[in-house]
């Protein structure tokens, strides 16, 4: 036992290295992990004190624990047995598939990434691209929501900037959990979105096992009080108009709700509108060609950042106009269940109606609505736009103008349209290009619900 042996130096170094790694892994690392976790918990406690809606423990749970909880959920277990029987597949194989679905769905939220990086990045990007305006805030109604209720922000989907804009504007209230489509399952978006609490869904995948796993995750998060953001339209509007609601996530929330037993759910309608939607031409082309999906590309982002740097250097920064957000009247699910017996279709229609009521009115859609209605004379355009502003304000819709000078606002809008080759102005007459007519209609439809009963005797009736 005490006999001396010769060991090569390289082997001794290797043995010492393995011993050091083992000591770190078994002795030091658990203590370090415990210390870091305690630091994180204290940081979250301090953060929760300044948030209107605290970050829930469910959101902070280890991702692996949530996956296993979902995998062994009784309802998922029943779905596994049913699926195995119907498709003549072994239950253990189906169980592995259910766990794979759970790994695909469950996020890995990082409070540091969300509040340390994402909020700052969202604020910078939003302010770089747009002049951000908040219309109807409904502050009193939002503050009156019970702290024990689960808040679900329900939004129209105009642009992929919606995620960025609402993440920043809701930062003082809570951390939002988004359902994100398959378009974003590319590097580096996928790991970033997971760390921000977003979960990926296959919108058109009707596999009953997958749907059950997804439904149970949504129901668990809702019952745990996780603040969520939902786009009931299920995708970007390709026509500019509000789309019919798709009821998947809303129906999961309703199905998991038990009146008088479950934690109450409060839906908060959020309306978004822009002077310029970055994807407008892509959406219009997809609608014309009947394309079913979009391929995500980093090229437009790279191109914009390159132009932004150049504009900063030359001192000529041009933003895309106004991006406006309005919050509608909150709707508790408990009251809805009593009044409507919990029909998801009725809930979807009611929420989309509340969104349209507070749709922000911004200059570009105002001008587009008048031009799409037939106004071609520049002198008549001022009166036509003013009539629409008066009509929107009479309906208590939030109207956002960059200045009180309406002629300046219209001239700025027309200049932007000319730069984008949508129209030309010759001798005071507006001449639309073929591309411009489609884009005008796209933006006009965003405020069309507010203008449905536009007075027949309005100042531009002769031009319509």
What do the PLM-derived regions correspond to, one by one?
Residues 1-229, 234-464:
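Membrane-interfacial terminal anchoring regions of lipid-handling membrane enzymes
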């Amino acid at each position: 036992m005490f006999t001396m042996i010769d060991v090569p130096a390289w082997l001794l170094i290797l043995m010492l290295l393995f011993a050091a790694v083992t000591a770190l892994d078994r002795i030091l690392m658990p203590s370090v992990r415990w210390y870091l976790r305690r630091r994180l918990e204290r940081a979250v406690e301090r953060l929760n004190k300044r948030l209107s809606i605290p970050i829930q423990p469910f959101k902070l749970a280890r991702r692996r624990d949530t996956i296993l909880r979902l995998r062994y959920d009784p309802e998922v277990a029943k779905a596994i047995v049913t699926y195995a029987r119907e498709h003549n597949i072994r239950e253990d194989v189906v169980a592995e598939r259910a766990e794979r679905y759970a790994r695909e769905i469950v996020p890995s939220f990082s409070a540091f990434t969300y509040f340390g990086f994402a909020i700052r990045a969202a604020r910078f990007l939003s302010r770089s691209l747009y002049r951000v305006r908040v219309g109807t805030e409904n502050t009193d109604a939002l503050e009156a929501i019970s702290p024990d209720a689960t808040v679900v922000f329900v939004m129209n989907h105009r642009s992929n900037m919606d995620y960025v804009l609402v993440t920043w504007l809701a930062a003082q209230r809570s951390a939002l959990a988004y359902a994100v489509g398959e378009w974003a399952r590319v590097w580096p978006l996928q790991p970033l979105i997971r760390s921000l609490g977003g979960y990926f869904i296959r919108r058109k995948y009707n596999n009953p096992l997958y749907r059950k796993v997804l439904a149970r995750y949504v129901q668990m998060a809702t019952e745990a009080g996780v603040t969520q953001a939902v786009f009931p339209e299920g995708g970007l509007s390709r026509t500019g108009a509000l789309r019919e609601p798709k009821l998947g996530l809303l129906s999961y929330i309703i199905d998991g709700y038990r009146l008088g037993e479950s934690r109450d759910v409060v839906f908060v309608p959020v309306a978004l509108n822009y002077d310029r939607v970055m994807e407008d031409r892509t959406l219009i082309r997809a609608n014309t060609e009947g394309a079913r999906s979009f391929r995500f590309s980093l090229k437009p982002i790279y191109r914009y950042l390159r132009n932004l740097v150049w504009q900063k250097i030359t001192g000529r920064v041009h933003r895309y106009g106004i991006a406006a957000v309005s919050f509608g009247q909150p709707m508790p699910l408990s009251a809805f269940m009593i009044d409507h017996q919990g029909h998801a279709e009725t809930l979807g229609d009611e929420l989309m109606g509340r969104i349209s009521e507070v749709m922000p009115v911004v200059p570009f859609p105002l001008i587009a609505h008048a031009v799409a209605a037939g106004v071609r004379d520049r002198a008549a355009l001022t009166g036509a736009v003013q009539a629409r502003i008066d009509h929107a304000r009479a309906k208590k819709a939030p109207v956002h103008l960059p200045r009180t000078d309406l002629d300046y606002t219209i001239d700025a809008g027309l200049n932007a349209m000319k730069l984008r080759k949508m129209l030309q102005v010759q001798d005071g007459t507006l001449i639309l290009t073929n591309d411009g007519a489609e884009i005008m209609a796209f933006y006009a439809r965003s405020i069309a619900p507010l203008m449905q009963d536009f007075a027949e005797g309005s100042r531009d009736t002769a031009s319509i």
